[in-house]
């Protein structure tokens, strides 16, 4: 153990665009006992301009060594990496991530299974050549109802049609949404009049535009590719559906042909809904992707190439798909069920949440040549299944995760431990009844999460990296 007089030579540098945060690159000697706070004090002292008083609000900084966030003292870092205090360290400093403080909470009638958002800068808005003035939240619930909320927490519209719990919801455009559920259906919905699309006049706002049939088990996840008008669906029938957001591009199914897919029940409500559905147009998928041996949990499009998709499954695998040929072109195997999936495109990483409670990072460019893929980074912190992931809209290194442990965690891939843990603000649920099922990180709204507590919780998500 080094004493308080032990020092190490360091060089501070930053890649921050703000010139006022740049300081001299002259080397300094500092105590090896310093942690982030002490190093941050030194940088603030170096940045202090002539005439500034001690009352000037300091800027909190994080520090990286060789691209990894420093989460210990300099001394502990040296010991862990087998370095001597006679070494010289280059410390990159960057604005620290601020706590994602609680902002608001909206009530819902049942468990919230899925969330999505739309704002003026959303990809779904840009691709549609439309505009919106205010952000909105889309929710799917276990009561079978899809809802849109405004930022006052008011339900603006409800979409009723599914005969079982909703499992996934996505905005397609300001006037279209898509949902899927335990009733094995994918539904396209019309939210409002769209002058750019010629729809049948008899379809009212908030009504089903088309039912997309083909899955033989619950459909638990959806992905939308806005530029090419495509949808991927993940099913518990071990299959992935490939659809169009425009029902005219898919083959018609006559309602009588698909009566066998209506869940058998004596429920008066379900019989009534099935009768109503008999008048709604139905479509079959453009293709079905088969190859998983267990239920598919999540699916996404590649951010840079819309002809490529990725999926994760309870069969422990991540699969890469060629959507043109409907073929699986790569499979890598882990030792646990994979439950959620996210791409960090600028880092060429796939982020996978697992039943083993940890989060794995994979590079899809590295072809899997063995049955066990081991060269990946593992993030540990959750204590139950990791079922939802969402990328930070302003920082390529950051994302949020949600878990059945009742928390949302904020991560930076440059650190093995989470930066912050968000708990439920009004947690009156019994232990094990506070699962969080969905998280979305929206630049306008914040970090939005929902689950068993029937509440849409919003935490600060913008400006926390400034």
From Swiss-Prot:
A single cellular component GO annotation: preribosome, large subunit precursor
WD repeat start-end pairs: 120-159, 161-199, 214-253, 291-331, 333-372, 381-421, 431-466
GO biological process, one term: maturation of LSU-rRNA from tricistronic rRNA transcript (SSU-rRNA, 5.8S rRNA, LSU-rRNA)
UniProt main location, coarse: nucleus
Keywords: Nucleus, Repeat, Ribosome biogenesis, rRNA processing, WD repeat
CDD domains, sorted: WD40
One Pfam family, short name: WD40
GO molecular function: ribonucleoprotein complex binding
Cellular compartments annotated: Nucleus, Nucleolus; Nucleus, Nucleoplasm
SUPFAM superfamilies: WD40 repeat-like
Family: Belongs to the WD repeat WDR12/YTM1 family.
Binding partners and assembly: Component of the NOP7 complex, composed of ERB1, NOP7 and YTM1. The complex is held together by ERB1, which interacts with NOP7 via its N-terminal domain and with YTM1 via a high-affinity interaction between the seven-bladed beta-propeller domains of the 2 proteins. The NOP7 complex associates with the 66S pre-ribosome. Interacts (via UBL domain) with MDN1 (via VWFA/MIDAS domain).
Role noted for this protein: Component of the NOP7 complex, which is required for maturation of the 25S and 5.8S ribosomal RNAs and formation of the 60S ribosome.
Stated name of the protein: Ribosome biogenesis protein YTM1
Protein source organism: Debaryomyces hansenii (strain ATCC 36239 / CBS 767 / BCRC 21394 / JCM 1990 / NBRC 0083 / IGC 2968) (Yeast)
The organism's taxonomic lineage, starting at the top: Eukaryota, Fungi, Dikarya, Ascomycota, Saccharomycotina
Gene: YTM1
């Amino acid at each position: 153990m080094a004493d308080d007089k032990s020092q190490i030579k360091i060089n501070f540098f930053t890649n921050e665009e703000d010139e006022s945060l740049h300081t001299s690159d002259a080397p300094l000697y500092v105590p090896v006992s310093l942690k982030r706070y002490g190093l941050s004090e030194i940088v603030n002292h170096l940045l202090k301009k002539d005439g500034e008083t001690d009352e000037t609000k300091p800027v909190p900084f994080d520090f990286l060594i060789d691209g990894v966030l420093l989460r210990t003292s300099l001394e502990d870092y040296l010991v862990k990496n087998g370095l001597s205090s006679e070494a010289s360290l280059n410390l990159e400093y960057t604005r620290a991530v601020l706590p994602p403080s609680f902002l608001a909470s909206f009530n819902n009638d049942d468990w919230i299974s899925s969330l999505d958002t739309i704002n003026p800068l959303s990809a779904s808005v840009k691709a549609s050549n439309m505009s919106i003035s205010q952000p909105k939240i889309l929710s799917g619930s276990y009561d079978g109802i899809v809802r849109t909320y405004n930022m006052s927490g008011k339900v603006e519209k409800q979409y009723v049609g599914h005969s079982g719990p909703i499992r996934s919801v996505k905005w397609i455009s300001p006037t279209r949404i898509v949902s899927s559920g335990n009733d094995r259906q994918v539904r396209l919905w019309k939210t409002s009049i769209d002058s750019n699309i010629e729809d049948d006049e008899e379809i009212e706002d908030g009504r089903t535009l088309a039912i997309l049939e083909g899955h033989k088990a619950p459909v638990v996840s959806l992905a939308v590719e806005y530029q090419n008008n495509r949808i991927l669906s993940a099913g518990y029938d071990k299959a992935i559906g490939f659809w169009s957001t425009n029902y005219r591009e898919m083959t018609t199914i006559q309602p009588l042909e698909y009566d066998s897919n209506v869940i058998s029940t004596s429920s008066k409500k379900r019989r009534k809904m099935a009768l109503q559905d008999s008048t709604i147009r139905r479509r079959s998928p453009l293709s079905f992707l088969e190859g998983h041996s267990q239920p598919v949990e999540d699916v996404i499009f590649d951010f840079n190439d819309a002809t490529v998709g990725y999926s994760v499954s309870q069969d422990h695998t991540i699969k890469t798909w060629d959507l043109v040929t409907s073929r699986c072109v790569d499979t890598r195997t882990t030792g646990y069920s994979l439950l959620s999936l996210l791409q960090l495109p600028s880092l060429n990483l796939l982020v996978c949440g697992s039943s083993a409670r940890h989060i794995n990072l994979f590079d899809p460019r590295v072809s899997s040549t063995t049955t066990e893929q081991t060269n990946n980074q593992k993030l540990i912190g959750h204590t139950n299944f990791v079922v939802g992931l969402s990328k930070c809209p302003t920082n390529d290194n950051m994302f949020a995760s949600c878990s059945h442990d009742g928390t949302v965690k904020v991560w930076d891939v440059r650190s093995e431990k989470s930066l912050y843990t968000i708990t439920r603000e009004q947690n009156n649920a019994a232990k094990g009844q506070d699962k969080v099922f969905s998280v979305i990180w929206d630049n306008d709204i914040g970090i939005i999460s929902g689950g068993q507590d029937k509440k849409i919780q919003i935490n600060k998500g913008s400006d926390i990296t400034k």
